[in-house]
């Protein structure tokens, strides 16, 4: 069933690309695929039982490249299942949002179905080569999404995105080869590499391999100072491109930390833990302060992504500091995975709403609008909910995630409290943006602004509802994540 979930969108992409059909049929086909994916997701989630340490649910393994110890291997645990669910939900929201797309809708549907398969493959993969193949192809998919449906300077932004992230993937590949060479017997199987931890007692060699893996994943996350591709990519990407980029693709980097770097290179991770914490703190504060200076709504949201992903980096870094209690480090990792899901839902909604501004008036400038609450109450209401969810107000998933991150991280490494002002700065910038966009007399580009259409509302509202459900009833998600977090912390402590 898991392989069907992964490859069904790819099959749909091939059909959409080859078979000529009316635009409406292509849109319906895309929605049908997303509906089928949601059904499969529900079946997987309800059928999921927490596997024992070192095992996986819904595991499948087929020989692929036996000469180098690589196979098509997929499976789910508490780290991957939430991100698979996030991927399916975000892509479904994008399919609904794109219902009225007039520019090559069949090609767009085919491309995003392809991209969905690649993203699902990254989170389901249990072989390092399979992970890398899906990881790399997702870069190509997003490149064409920005180039083909972007605005502003899409060619330049797409090229910068591709070159920067592709360079990161090459560095990541070097790290993977280092793990393979050190393993005895040589293998790319994640479970075997985790069991062996082949570079555990290798000194500086393990540090070099971890550095390669960290840099490759940090570029995709992105963390400071590897973030410079992100703002232009978001600014010039279409709304659904930004939603997928922020909601799903950025999680590949942080997922790689907990799936590959931490369990396979535990000794090196512990040695680098304080550096990782420092990068997380800098990313939190830098992302918040630079976001505060933005006048472009999309760039502002992009920099808040640097801030929010910085919390994840900070938490996984704290998990490598053994001076803290094991329970606190487990809470930090649980918070990190919860933050990945939370940020994906909320930021995807924010980027879709920002896309409405550009679609209606061709501008993301905050000062070009004012008093939007009067002509567009649905837009104003959902934007306000998304903003408050993003700043971490209780009742939403962001609060659950950040509370766990700081509770666990401060216990292990009190210096992580230096990142707390980032929450205040993000609150200030979102409240200021809401005041400028929504309140006061209707002026500028807000005059005669068309409120959200039904398809736009149906795309955004479920994302925010998901954040609310996690914020109020987090147990269904935490019960999945917590056992896997304990395993990761135990592996890092070896």
Q: Language-model segments: what does each one mean?
A:
Residues 49-70, 137, 169-227, 232, ...:
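Juxtamembrane/interfacial segments at transmembrane-helix boundaries in multi-pass membrane proteins
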Residues 21-37, 101-114, 129-132, 150-171, ...:
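Membrane-interfacial loop-to-helix junctions in multi-pass inner-membrane proteins
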Residues 23-24, 107-114, 118-202, 290-363:
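Alpha-helical multi-pass transmembrane bundles of energy-transducing inner-membrane proteins
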Residues 1-8, 76-87, 128-141, 206-219, ...:
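Structural signature of hydrophobic alpha-helical transmembrane segments
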């Amino acid at each position: 069933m898991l392989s069907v979930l992964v490859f069904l969108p790819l099959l749909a992409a091939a059909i959409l690309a080859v078979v000529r059909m009316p635009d409406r049929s292509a849109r319906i086909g895309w929605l049908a695929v997303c509906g089928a994916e949601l059904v499969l997701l529900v079946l997987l989630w309800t059928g999921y039982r927490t596997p024992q340490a070192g095992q996986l649910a819904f595991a499948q393994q087929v020989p692929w490249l036996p000469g180098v110890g690589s196979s098509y291997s997929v499976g789910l645990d508490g780290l991957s299942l939430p991100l698979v669910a996030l991927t399916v939900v975000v892509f479904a929201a994008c399919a609904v949002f794109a219902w009225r797309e007039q520019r090559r809708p069949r090609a767009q549907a085919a491309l995003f179905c392809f991209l969905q398969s690649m993203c699902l493959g990254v989170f389901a993969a249990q072989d390092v080569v399979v992970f890398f193949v899906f990881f790399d192809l997702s870069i190509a998919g997003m490149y064409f999404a920005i180039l083909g449906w972007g605005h502003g300077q899409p060619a330049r932004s797409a090229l910068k995105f591709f070159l920067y992230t592709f360079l990161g993937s090459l560095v990541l590949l070097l790290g993977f080869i280092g793990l393979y060479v050190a393993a005895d017997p040589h293998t790319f199987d994640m479970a075997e590499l985790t069991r062996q931890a082949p570079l555990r007692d290798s000194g500086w060699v393990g540090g070099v391999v971890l550095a390669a893996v960290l840099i490759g994943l940090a570029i995709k996350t992105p963390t400071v100072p590897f973030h410079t591709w992100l703002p232009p990519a978001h600014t010039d990407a279409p709304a659904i491109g930004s939603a997928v980029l922020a909601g799903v693709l950025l999680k590949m980097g942080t997922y790689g930390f907990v799936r590959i770097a931490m369990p396979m290179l535990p000794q090196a991770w512990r040695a680098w833990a304080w550096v990782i914490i420092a990068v997380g703190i800098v990313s939190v504060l830098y992302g918040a302060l630079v976001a505060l200076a933005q006048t472009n709504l999309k760039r502002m949201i992009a920099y808040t992504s640097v801030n929010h992903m910085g919390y994840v980096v900070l938490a996984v870094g704290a998990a490598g500091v053994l001076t803290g209690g094991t329970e606190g480090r487990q809470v930090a990792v649980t918070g990190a995975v919860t933050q990945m899901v939370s940020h994906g839902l909320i930021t995807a909604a924010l980027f879709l709403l920002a896309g409405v501004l550009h679609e209606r008036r061709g501008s993301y400038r905050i000062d070009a609008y004012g008093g939007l609450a009067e002509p567009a109450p649905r837009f104003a209401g959902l934007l306000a909910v998304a903003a408050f969810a993003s700043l971490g107000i209780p009742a939403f998933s962001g609060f659950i995630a950040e509370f766990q991150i700081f509770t666990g991280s401060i216990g292990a490494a009190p210096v992580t409290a230096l990142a707390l002002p980032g929450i205040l700065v993000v609150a200030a910038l979102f409240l200021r943006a809401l005041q400028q966009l929504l309140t006061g007399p209707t002026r500028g580009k807000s005059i005669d602004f068309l409120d959200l259409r039904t398809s736009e509302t149906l795309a955004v509202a479920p994302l925010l509802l998901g954040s609310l459900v996690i914020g109020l009833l987090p147990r269904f998600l935490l019960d999945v994540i917590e056992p896997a977090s304990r395993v990761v912390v135990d592996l890092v402590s070896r």
